[in-house]
């Protein structure tokens, strides 16, 4: 073999090895199931000829010839799904041949498209500065992501108040807890848990708005009869230098009344899963939502179960201060500067939102009644203790019976919230399950 032929052969082998070493491309696939978009992840190498990969966690095999891609996915139940697409740069478009949902012997064709997801930039976790230009009034999987981030990345951004007003007093969005986002978190898939670390919350204006109200759930008939003149707006002055707030036009008994601020996020959510309609930013669920839990503040880590590729994280409805339950219907509603980072916990079951501070584990139960919310909080805490500490139900009952505290987190929404709290210092006496995730310390 001549030296020229040898050099060419080595060059080809080197190029082939380099392609083999490249990570497979990731695509976000949108399949139109009779007008209902389903979002799934496709992992596939860029090579020509035979290809293998995964679609929504299931294995696939196929071929790529030029810009034409054919592959078959085999589901865990043995069902097959056949895809054919044409690639144009970072986009795929084609048809998916699925089993008919009502008759397994029949097939149904569905159009689909896909966009190629970006590769992680070199250099490790990054700091992103994001200035929002539009806001969401639904927790929806259909809204285009405003930013793509990776586990370990941090984001600095801002939120509006619940009325859609920004730091300069300008109305920027429709009232009703407009949210910043969604943020697409790479590596987050359905069945995972998204950990959101609240690194910084800062007031960015000198006032907040509230009401002189008491929510109906907190009123006796006698008190309700006296409260007919309430529900009037109350503006609060925020002294950012001293970290305190007072009713702006207070007279009489409250003319010298000041309270220390304790900034928090009322809204924090990921997108609901397939089959669920987009959810109002005033509502809550296991995905988070308008939780109005005053422990979601600087230094806390919030854990939310992921139901869509990329999680699709929303945040907003910041409060300068809120008492337990948000009994005035509106807390001290204001805009906020926010910094957060994200991590992904793979393949972890979680029934309800969790919050971890430096000193406590907290589970937020939500339901149509306080009884239902209490049950959800108790079940969620029992699940956490079993997962992270390996406790049996008997052992969990002993820990809860001796040490748990319950607080009413929210009374102002369509559903109510009850939080179960445990001091982490007590649990230092119990050995953790090796490898379980840790949040705030």
Model-derived features with residue positions:
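Bacterial N-terminal signal peptides
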Residues: 7-15
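Central antiparallel beta-sheet cores of small beta-barrel/beta-sandwich binding domains
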Residues: 21-89, 93-103
């Amino acid at each position: 073999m001549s030296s020229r032929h040898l050099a060419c052969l080595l060059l080809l082998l080197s190029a082939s090895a380099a392609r083999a070493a490249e990570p497979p491309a990731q695509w976000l696939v949108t399949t139109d199931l009779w007008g209902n978009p389903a979002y799934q992840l496709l992992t596939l190498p860029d090579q020509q000829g035979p290809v293998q990969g995964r679609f929504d966690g299931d294995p696939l095999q196929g071929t790529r010839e030029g810009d034409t891609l054919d592959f078959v996915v085999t589901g865990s139940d043995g069902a097959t799904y056949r895809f054919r697409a044409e690639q144009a740069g970072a986009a795929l478009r084609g048809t998916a041949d699925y089993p008919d949902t009502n008759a397994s012997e029949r097939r149904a064709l569905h159009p689909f498209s896909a966009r190629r997801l970006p590769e992680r930039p070199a250099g490790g976790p990054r700091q992103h500065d994001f200035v929002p230009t539009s806001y969401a009034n639904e927790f929806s999987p259909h809204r285009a992501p405003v930013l793509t981030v990776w586990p370990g990345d941090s984001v600095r951004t801002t939120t509006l108040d619940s009325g859609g007003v920004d730091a300069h007093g300008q109305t920027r969005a429709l009232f009703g807890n407009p949210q910043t986002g969604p943020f697409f978190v790479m590596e987050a898939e359905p069945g995972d848990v998204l950990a959101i670390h609240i690194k910084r919350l800062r007031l960015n204006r000198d006032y907040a708005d509230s009401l002189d109200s008491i929510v109906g759930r907190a009123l006796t008939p006698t008190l309700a009869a006296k409260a007919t003149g309430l529900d009037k707006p109350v503006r609060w002055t925020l002294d950012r230098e001293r970290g305190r707030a007072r009713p702006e036009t207070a007279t009489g008994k409250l003319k010298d009344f000041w309270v220390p601020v304790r900034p928090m996020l009322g809204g924090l959510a990921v997108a609901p899963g397939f089959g669920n309609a987009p959810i109002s930013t005033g509502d809550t669920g296991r995905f988070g939502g308008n939780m109005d839990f005053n422990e979601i503040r600087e230094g806390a880590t919030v854990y939310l179960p992921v139901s869509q590729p990329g999680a699709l994280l929303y945040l907003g409805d910041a409060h300068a201060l809120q008492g337990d339950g948000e009994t005035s219907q509106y807390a001290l509603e204001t805009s906020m500067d926010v910094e957060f980072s994200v991590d992904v916990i793979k393949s972890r079951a979680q029934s309800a939102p969790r919050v971890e501070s430096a000193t406590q584990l907290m589970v937020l139960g939500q339901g149509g009644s306080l009884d239902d919310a209490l049950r959800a909080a108790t079940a969620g805490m029992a699940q956490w203790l079993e997962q992270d500490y390996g406790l049996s139900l008997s052992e969990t009952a002993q820990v809860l019976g001796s040490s748990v505290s319950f607080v009413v987190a929210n009374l102002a929404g369509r559903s109510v919230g009850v939080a179960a709290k445990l001091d982490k210092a007590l649990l230092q006496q119990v050995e953790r399950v090796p490898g379980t995730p840790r949040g705030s310390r």
